[in-house]
Amino acid sequence: MTSVQIEAISTDSKDIPLQEASLDIWDKKYRLKSKTGDIIDQSIDDTFKRVARALANAELTDELRNKWYDSFLWALRRGAIPAGRITSNAGAQEHKPATSTINCTVSGIINDSMNGILEKVHEAGLTLKAGCGIGYEFSTLRPKGAYVSGAGAYTSGPLSFMDIYDKMCFTVSSAGGRRGAQMATFEIGHPDVMEFIRAKRENGRLRQFNCSLLITDEFMAAVEANENWPLAFPINEAEAAELDLDNADQVLWREWPHSDGYVCRDDGLVACRIFKTVPARRLWDMIMSSTYDFAEPGFILIDRINEMNNNWFCENIRATNPCGEQPLPPYGACLLGSVNLTRFVEKPFTDEARFNWDEYHKVARVFTRMLDNVVEINGLPLGKQRDEIARKRRHGMGFLGLGSTINMLRMKYGSPESLEFTEKVAREMALAGWEEALELSREKGPAPIMKEEFEVTGDMLRQRPELEADGYKLGDKVSGRVLHARYSRYMQKVAEINPELVDALAEEGARFTHHTSIAPTGTISLSIANNVSNGIEPSFAHHYSRNVIREGRKSKEKVEVFSYELLAYRHLVNKRAMPYAEDEASKLPDYFITAEDVTPMQHVDIQAAAQRWIDSSISKTANVPTDFPYEDFKGIYTYAHAQGLKGCTTFRFNPEAFQGVLVQERDLENTLYRFVLDDGQVVEVKGNEEIEYDGEMHTAANLFDALKEGYYGKF
C-alpha cells in the first residue's frame, strides 16, 4: 500500500502540493506521452497549456486564438477542469488520432430485429474504442418468449442480447487499456422488467453495465394507490388484427421511443399489448430489495427528465450516459467540464471565510466558451453522433469539491446554510452560462436547431397546453429558439431571475441547448484537484483507501489518500490534525463531516437544491449505513420523487455482493472474507489483510471481489 507523508508547509490552500495518489492518476490517465512512452506533458501546467491551445485553435483568427488561449489558460489555473476525455485527448491527435473529446453518448434506438441489435453492437464498439461512454435502452426489444415470425421461433429476450453488448465492451476495453463504460435503461412497464431487476445477482454477469429503470409518474402513483401494474409491449400492425384496441384489459396506450411499425394514435401514444399485470407494490419491493442489497438497478424518473428537457419539442429521452448525469436522445452526445469550487474560498477555516462569487462568475463565463469550442474537435466516430452534437451543441458544465468547499467555509454538509449555498452555486453557474450563450450566439451564431421551424403536433399540445393558450394550433410552424426559450420549463425558471436575458434568447437563439450537468468527477477530483470531494458529494472520508485498476496487476490495488480539506487544514491550521484522533490537540472541528455523517434525506436535499438550476441531470450517491432499516430505505426513493429529482442512487456497504471503489478501512477491518482452497480447506481473513496469491500480494477484499466477479487477471 502506498503511504503518503503530509506536513504543514504553506499559508495558502491553493499552494498545497499534489499528493502521491493524485500525481499517479494524472500520470496514468491524463499526462500526454508519445507512442513510445516518452513524456510530453512535463507538468500538470503543461497539460493545461496543451488543452488551452487545442480549444483556442477552434477560434477563427490568429488574434482570437492567442487572446482566448491566454483566457482559457487563466481559467484552467483557477479551477476550470475539462472532463477526462478533453484533458486526455485535446491537442493529442498526433499521438492518438482515433480518440474523442466527448465523455457521454447514447446509442441510436435498438430496433427490434437481429439487424437492429447487431448494428448497434457495431456502433457501440466504435464508440467505446474512441474512449466515449455509451448508454442504451433495451426495453425496445420484445419480451422473452415472444414469437418472431421471420425466424419461426421465439425470442430469448432483451437480457440475452445485453450479454452480447457486455462481452463486446469488456473485449474493447481490455484491448484499449481503458475500462469501457455502459448504461442500460429499461422501461418499468416492460414484461421482462423483473428479469432485468434480478440480472446482476448472478456473479460476473453484466458487469460492464450500470443498470437503471425508467420509472414513470404513473408507476409511482400506482405504488402509492396500491394498484395493479400492467406489463406490456407495443403492438405491430399484423398483431392489431388479433386484438380489440378498445379493450382496456388487453391494450393500453403509452409513450414509446418510436412508432415505426407500431399502432399509433394522433396524440403520439402507442398501442401496447398487456402480457400480465402485477401488484405495483410487489414490483416496487422487488426493486427496493435489489437496490438495498446490490445498489442496482438505479432509479431514473423519466417523466421528470422529459418534462424538464430544454429540447422537449423534438426529443423523447429514454437513456442516459453511464453515470446518469446526461439524459440524451438517440445518437446524443455531450461534453463535460467541472469547476473546482475550493479555488474560490478565501481565508478558509476562519470566521472571515468567504466565497469569491465574482471570480467564480468570470471563470464560468470563460469556461462556457472553452467547452463550446470542444464541439469543433469532438472526434466522435459516427456521423449521426457528429450531426447531433453539431445541431444542438450540448454541453454539461458542473462543479466538483462542493463538500470540501462547505467544510472550508465552516458549514456542515446537509445543513440549511449548505443547501442555500448549493443552490446559489448552481444558480450563478446557470446564469453565467446563459449570458455567455447569448454573447456567443451574437458572435458565432446560435445552435442550428434554434433556426429550424417545427410543426406543432398533438403531442406538443398535450405536453404544453399553454401553446394553445398563446394562439398556436395543430400544424402551425414555430421556431426552435421560441420553443426552447419560451416553453422549456427550465428556461421559464431562468426567466423568473432574468426575463430580459430569456427574451433575447427567444429572439436570437442560444449558442447551445443545454449548459449544466453535475458528473461524479471521480478521477479528475482525485488527480488534478488533489482529492477534493467528488462532484456534488461530501468527502467520502478524510483518510481512506481507494481501489484502483493498475496495469499489470491481477486485482485492484489499494491506495491511501487524504481529502483536500484535511491537507488544507493541516497546512493552514494544525499540522497534527487527523480524523478520529483521541488527542484533543489533533482533533478536527465538528464541521469536518464525511459521507457517513450525512443522512440519506440530507443527500436528497442537497441534490434537490442543485437540480433546480441544472438543466440536464446530476450523478449523486446517497450513502446508507449497512444496518439502515429496509423500510426507511424505501422512503429515500419516495422522498427523492417528491423533491423533484430526476434520479436517485444509493450505496450500502455489502461485501457479500460487491466491493466498492471507495472503502472505509474499518469496514474492511470488520469484514471477514472466506476463501475455499483447492483441497477444500477454508481460510477466513479480514478484508484489509494482505495475502499472497498467484505470485502477487493483494488485499483480501480486492482478491475476493476479483475472483467472485470473474475479472481476476483480466485488466
Where is each model-derived feature located?
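Acidic/polar, glycine-rich intrinsically disordered N-terminal extensions of enzymes
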Residues: 1-101, 250, 255-271, 284-291, ...
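Active-site cavity-forming subdomains of large catalytic enzyme subunits
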Residues: 7-16, 102-357, 380-384, 388, ...
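Core structural elements
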Residues: 18-28, 73-94, 188-189, 368-377, ...
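Catalytic alpha/beta core of large soluble enzyme barrels
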Residues: 22, 325-327, 371-376, 446, ...
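Active-site-adjacent structural elements in folded domains
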Residues: 87-92, 357, 381-392, 405, ...
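Internal maturation/activation junctions in enzymes
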Residues: 234-235, 363-386, 412-521, 618
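Long, charged, mostly alpha-helical binding arms that flank functional sites
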Residues: 333-397, 407, 581-587
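Catalytic phosphate/nucleotide-handling subdomain of diverse soluble enzymes
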Residues: 409, 417-436, 528-551
